[in-house]
Amino acid sequence: GKPSRPRPAPIQPRPPHPRL
């Protein structure tokens, strides 16, 4: 069988950065 490699964590959408 294929060696199970750890899958990368899903990219979480970041909240919009407030412009100051």
Swiss-Prot record:
Induction field: By bacterial infection.
Residue numbers spanned by region Disordered: 1-20
Record flagged with keyword Secreted: yes
Domain of life: Eukaryota
Annotated localization: Secreted
Entry's Gene Ontology BP terms: defense response to Gram-negative bacterium; innate immune response
Family of the protein in this entry: Belongs to the apidaecin family.
Function: Antimicrobial peptide active against many Gram-negative enterobacterial and plant-associated bacterial species. Not active against other bacterial species like H.pylori, P.mirabilis, B.pertussis or N.gonorrhoeae.
Protein name, entry field: Apidaecin 3+
Originating species: Pimpla disparis (Parasitic wasp)
Upper taxonomic lineage: Eukaryota, Metazoa, Ecdysozoa, Arthropoda, Hexapoda
